[in-house]
Amino acid sequence: MTAQTNRQFLLAKRPVGAATRETFTYQQVPVGEPAAGQILVKNEYLSLDPAMRGWMNEGKSYIPPVGIGEVMRALGVGQVIASNNPGFAVGDYVNGALGVQDYFLGEPRGFYKVDPKLAPLPRYLSALGMTGMTAYFALLDVGAPKAGETVVLSGAAGAVGSIAGQIAKLKGCRVVGIAGGADKCKFLVDELGFDGAIDYKNEDVHAGLKRDCPKGVDVYFDNVGGDILDAVLSRLNLKARVVICGAISQYNNKEAVKGPANYLSLLVNRARMEGFVVMDYASQFAAAGQEMAGWMAKGQLKSKEDIVEGLETFPETLTKLFSGENFGKLVLKV
């Protein structure tokens, strides 16, 4: 590849079930020059998120779907190499919706500057980026945990779950994570300080909840949906809060999304289940980011990035999210 060539992955069709390489069109195009108000960014790292699967679907959502023939949407960090925008200078590092490509050329809507001297660039896609903001606001605003309460998280060894669980510990809660595999569960307890971990691949989730949550569940932070959501609903306490942050077990379904059978537990326990979209809190990101950075500086918050190299691996790397292969925040090094 030369400096004048931009490799891109475009959405070729709307997938039924899992996205595959055939879901995308790969192309190489010349790199243009920024027009008035635009910047040219050399992409360095791209964030791979479960939400990307939803962005491929047509229909009403919190954000318009990626259009057929458009560059696949992805958040990322990169360096400005040409600018025709007074707000950004050559050499600036930025975080924004860069797309699955080598270079971003366009208006920097919603972009903001980051400092590689303060933290490694991939961290601005994990704890210090949208992932961290999701964990922070979903837990603290929707979950509203109180010291001494029991907080359970699914997808607990993933990007959002691992950070949200640590924040719950900082708030004085008993924290139990649900993850797939002994290594992930060991990481939650030994490295992140969780009070318990349930290996859904090798043990019965109901039994694990009974063991690790003998007093029931006050806050459930759901990233997976499906049978695990149903199991936790059966253990809710009075006035419990259920945060619907994601449902990764359902995103690739070819049939209708499976609803919870135990939803009457919400009625009996006067509990609340609420959906969450991080962009609702955009005006508060700066203050939250300062608090998150402070926790990290004190060693109270750890961030794990799972970095895969090579833009050309994008379709296969994306599938790691849905098979549970990733360990921490999945990042693609361009």
Task: Tell me the role of every PLM-derived stretch.
Residues 204-215:
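Short amphipathic alpha-helix with an adjacent loop that forms part of the alpha/beta core around
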Residues 2-4, 279-334:
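C-terminal hydrophobic helical "lid"/dimerization subdomain
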Residues 95, 152, 198, 220-221:
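N-terminal Rossmann-like NAD(P) cofactor-binding module of classical short-chain dehydrogenase/reductase
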Residues 102, 180-188, 205, 257-263:
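Short, glycine/polar-rich helix-capping loops at beta-to-alpha or helix-loop-helix junctions
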Residues 72-78, 89-155, 300:
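NAD(P)H dinucleotide-binding glycine-rich loop of Rossmann-like/cofactor-binding domains
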Residues 30-48, 56-100:
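Glycine-rich beta-strand-centered segment in the early N-terminal region that forms part
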Residues 227-301, 334:
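Glycine-rich phosphate-binding loop and adjacent beta-alpha segment
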Residues 125-203:
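Mid-domain Rossmann-like dinucleotide-binding core that forms the NAD(H)/NADP(H) cofactor-binding site
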